[in-house]
Amino acid sequence: MSRLGNRADWADDEEFDDPSALPPQQVTTNKDGTKTVVSYRFNDEGKKVKVTRRIKTTVVREHVNPQVAERRSWAKFGLEKGHAAGPSFDTTSVGENIVFRPSVNWRAQAAEAEKAGGEKGSIKDQLKDKKVKCRICSGEHFTARCPFKDTMAPVDESTGAAGGEPGAEDEAAAGGLGAGTSSYVPPHMRKGAASGGERMAGKYEKDDLATLRVTNVSELAEESEIRDLFERFGRVTRVFLARDRETQRAKGFAFISFADRSDAARACEKMDGFGYRHLILRVEFAKRAT
């Protein structure tokens, strides 16, 4: 019996080492108030890694309303009964504190804002499906913002001029307005107004003689590439590549303005029929305002 009592049990062996066991975490308090935490873990390769972290604790004191502090200590009730103290992230969102100060006539202001918002919304719905079209180059932008408004005539003006001059009957009718009476006749309806306006239309003759229209352009083309193609023949002052407003891809045509007409003529001769991005370019002079 004495021999059995002195025999050590294998379960009481404290020196048994498990190769997969990790050493316990060690926390050391430093003199400066920080804590050094040493822990161990296994990395992705299965090797034991030692991790040392130094933690500094900072106490932030906040002065709040005593009633607010008291409400925070209340026990939760209702659907939140039994939950931990503090806001729950699934039911509470913490945001900026906004101070609401209603004015005296806030009802009238709210009614006016609602009315204005309804009118804007209706106008927006009406113009939602409408697209802006330039009258000069047929691009999807306002005519006033067209880069070629000073070099090309609008489409309606060019087509109207091609139809011929107004007849004598129209001139007589326009000139006869207000004859013998004191009624007012608008300047554009007076006799000779059309011819005078045509003589004054010098803005369309500024540099339209040196502007080329390029068609059959790839939808993947870029303005810089087109400029590089045509700058070989002379100084290019402006390049406009029409793009789709939604997809931002080229619409198939572009305008190139040269500083000298001779350079534009040479570029038109060389680049007409030129292969670019698997397409054959069609180059011609832009229609001049008549």
From Swiss-Prot:
Entry GO terms, CC: eukaryotic 43S preinitiation complex; eukaryotic 48S preinitiation complex; eukaryotic translation initiation factor 3 complex, eIF3e; eukaryotic translation initiation factor 3 complex, eIF3m; multi-eIF complex
Pfam families: eIF3g, RRM_1
GO molecular function: RNA binding; translation initiation factor activity
Disulfide bonds: none
Cell compartments where the protein resides: Cytoplasm
Ranges where the record places region Disordered: 1-35, 157-200
Domain RRM stretches: 210-288
Keyword Hydrolase: no
CDD domains associated with the record: eIF3G, RRM_eIF3G_like
UniProt GO BP: formation of cytoplasmic translation initiation complex; translation reinitiation; translational termination
InterPro entries hit by this protein: eIF3_g, eIF3g_N, eIF3G_RRM, Nucleotide-bd_a/b_plait_sf, RBD_domain_sf, RRM_dom
Coiled coil: none
SUPFAM superfamilies: RNA-binding domain, RBD (SSF54928)
Keywords per UniProt: Cytoplasm, Initiation factor, Protein biosynthesis, RNA-binding
UniProt cross-references to PANTHER family, sorted A to Z: EUKARYOTIC TRANSLATION INITIATION FACTOR 3 SUBUNIT G (PTHR10352)
Family to which the UniProt record says this protein belongs: Belongs to the eIF-3 subunit G family.
Known function: RNA-binding component of the eukaryotic translation initiation factor 3 (eIF-3) complex, which is involved in protein synthesis of a specialized repertoire of mRNAs and, together with other initiation factors, stimulates binding of mRNA and methionyl-tRNAi to the 40S ribosome. The eIF-3 complex specifically targets and initiates translation of a subset of mRNAs involved in cell proliferation. This subunit can bind 18S rRNA.
Subunit structure: Component of the eukaryotic translation initiation factor 3 (eIF-3) complex.
Protein name as it appears in the record: Eukaryotic translation initiation factor 3 subunit G
